[in-house]
Regions:
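N-terminal segments that cap or nucleate solenoid repeat domains
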Residues: 12-26, 30, 34
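Ankyrin repeat A-helix N-terminal signature
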Residues: 1-8, 37-47, 74-83, 95-106, ...
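Ankyrin repeat domain, specifically the short helix-to-loop turn at the C-terminus of the second helix
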Residues: 14-22, 52-60, 111-119, 147-156, ...
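Ankyrin-repeat-protein effector appendages
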Residues: 91-93, 116, 162-165, 170-187
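Ankyrin-repeat and related helical/solenoid repeat scaffolds used for protein-protein interactions
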Residues: 121-174
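N-terminal start and proteolytic maturation junction detector
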Residues: 15, 85, 93-94
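Ankyrin-repeat boundary/"N-cap" motif
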Residues: 1, 26-40, 64-79, 90-97, ...
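Low-complexity, intrinsically disordered tandem-repeat tracts enriched in small residues
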Residues: 10, 26, 57-59, 63, ...
Length: 187
């Protein structure tokens, strides 16, 4: 996506729409819609442009992929995960979140999705909410993202996933002191 400029992206999407393509159709083998794929590439100008175009074209901001992940979860690092936990100590532990290091600029894309009605309490197949994804993404901008989510409603800060972990637990594991302090105010 790095070399795909904003104008090319818009032209490509417009051509697809003119040919009868619908943005809510699965765009990859994991069942991600084009909006979810664009959210995964939101760190690039073309990705942000695609997200805006797709939202303005009526893409479903709450469409889920085979993992139960919404586009906003993919913005904050959602990735394919088969649910298996490695049984050997030498293998790193993996999660469905943390697949992308997020930046401060992602707040603009997050706000766009929230304004379009993204569900802040949706859960993926493993019980993770948007706050779990934000906590697992990176320490840069995580508190600001969580604060923006709070501005759009009352997410369940104490919600635990299928492993019994809350967003606060994940933030503590990542040593994200700023997010930990912020989430403690709402716990």
């Amino acid at each position: 996506h790095k070399n795909f400029c904003k104008e090319d992206c818009l032209h490509f999407l417009q051509c697809l729409m003119e040919c009868g393509w619908t943005p809510d159709s699965p765009a990859d083998k994991y069942g991600n819609t084009s909006l979810s794929v664009a959210c995964q590439g939101a760190g690039y100008e073309a990705g942000v442009c695609a997200v805006r175009y797709l939202v303005e074209s009526g893409a479903d901001v709450n469409a889920v992929n085979m993992q139960g992940q919404t586009p906003v979860m993919n913005l904050y690092g959602g990735r394919f995960w088969d649910g298996n936990i490695p049984r050997f100590a030498g293998f790193p532990r993996s999660y469905p979140y943390g697949g992308r290091s997020c930046t401060d600029e992602d707040a603009e894309t997050l706000e766009l999705l929230l304004e379009a009605g993204a569900d802040i309490n949706a859960k993926d197949n493993w019980g993770n909410t948007l706050l779990h994804y934000i906590a697992g993404s990176s320490t840069r901008g995580s508190k600001e993202a969580a604060a923006l989510v709070m501005d759009f409603g009352s997410p369940d800060v104490s919600a635990v996933n299928n492993e019994g972990l809350s967003a606060l637990d994940i933030a503590m594991e990542k040593n994200d002191e700023t997010l930990v302090k912020f989430l403690l105010k709402y716990s």
